Amino acid sequence: MVEINGKEYGLFYSVRAHCEYDDYVCEHPNVSVTRAIIQKALIMSKAYCDIHGGTPLKSADIMNLPNSEYMKLMKAVVEQEAKDSGIEIETEPTEKNAVSREL
């Protein structure tokens, strides 16, 4: 779960969600890393809601976030995928590795 602007959203990494994400990236070879992560956030949010109910994230929800909330969501997506894949990562954002929202 990640809290964005006071509302909690669940993220669930599944093989199905991963396949949908991979299909999206394969179909769009010019996709930016930022857009790919946003797409993954939307798919993971939908996968969570399919299992647990609730309202999934929408792209407008993400694009209207303040930078701090946006970075929190991106971090949650990466951490959830890594956790469910059994990978240990370091995800503390810094100025050096910050990602722009420009698509």
Describe the residue ranges of each PLM region:
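Short, surface-exposed, charged amphipathic helix/loop patches that serve as local interaction elements
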Residues: 12-103
